Amino acid sequence: MTIALGKFTKDENDLFDIMDDWLRRDRFVFVGWSGLLLFPCAYFALGGWFTGTTFVTSWYTHGLASSYLEGCNFLTAAVSTPANSLAHSLLLLWGPEAQGDFTRWCQLGGLWTFVALHGAFALIGFMLRQFELARSVQLRPYNAIAFSAPIAVFVSVFLIYPLGQSGWFFAPSFGVAAIFRFILFFQGFHNWTLNPFHMMGVAGVLGAALLCAIHGATVENTLFEDGDGANTFRAFNPTQAEETYSMVTANRFWSQIFGVAFSNKRWLHFFMLFVPVTGLWMSALGVVGLALNLRAYDFVSQEIRAAEDPEFETFYTKNILLNEGIRAWMAAQDQPHENLIFPEEVLPRGNAL
């Protein structure tokens, strides 16, 4: 058959090859196959956010003003979550809630699901972009692996947490002050700061900041004095092949300071990768736990003793009371759909009240 029909040859003008050639061409801004996901999703997510913060009110979902048009500023404007009555609806523009009416869709909070879902896929597209470029230039994929950590945090906080609760309503709205409100909510209703996964996240982020500061200062401190420029930026050519700092000197310095030091650059830089990425992954796992209403550390024996003995108090029992105050103050305003009414005598009083 092969002799009769001839050898099969692939059409060189195959549509896939043409597309592949155009997408992966060397240009100022690389597109790639990942760009087919990244660029449209990022465009729609950012566009939805700018549209919402500029024009769209949160009156119908939260009883709040949330746009520049209503007098908010950059810190107080937000794209707010849908009302709790809409549960986990995707709130599609053409769905049964909005029925193709754009104004109604915005009033119902449709922009939040639009921004959240397109934002999640944009972040995934950016990670795939790093994979694709690394493969093209024959690098290992650690950049993409590292970027999976902020993606995990975004997905756990904005998508998985509200999926575990009664609706998108309990996710953070997209705004600065809105995120602060969400943090207070997390503390008051979940005691988040006493959650071991939050502790690991804080250790990872602050530890990474410390490592970056130490690493940058050490490299600057151990630069070879063989440049004739006035400062670091003038002394060396940015394209030179040879190193401009001494690892041996750095190792000796920190060995004297701490008694231990990194012996090679691979281990040093892997550690700088490992600390923040692991911290963010752990905090994302913790938020998944909160979605299921898992509790933080509970020191019940201290609570019982504090209830029995008015003179006994610890920072833990103090924080428990503060959390109760947050819940009492926030619940009525933050969950208007519940019609919660707290009598004046049960609300906590601060010195200013």
From Swiss-Prot:
Cofactor binding, note field: The D1/D2 heterodimer binds P680, chlorophylls that are the primary electron donor of PSII, and subsequent electron acceptors. It shares a non-heme iron and each subunit binds pheophytin, quinone, additional chlorophylls, carotenoids and lipids. There is also a Cl(-1) ion associated with D1 and D2, which is required for oxygen evolution. The PSII complex binds additional chlorophylls, carotenoids and specific lipids.
Bilayer topology: Multi-pass membrane protein
UniProt-listed Enzyme Commission number(s): 1.10.3.9
Membership in a protein family: Belongs to the reaction center PufL/M/PsbA/D family.
Binding site for a plastoquinone: H215, F262
Subcellular location: Plastid, Chloroplast thylakoid membrane
Transmembrane segments: 41-61, 125-141, 153-166, 208-228, 279-295
Biological-process GO terms, alphabetical: photosynthetic electron transport in photosystem II
Binding site for pheophytin a: Q130, N143
N-acetylthreonine: residues bearing it: T2
Protein name: Photosystem II D2 protein
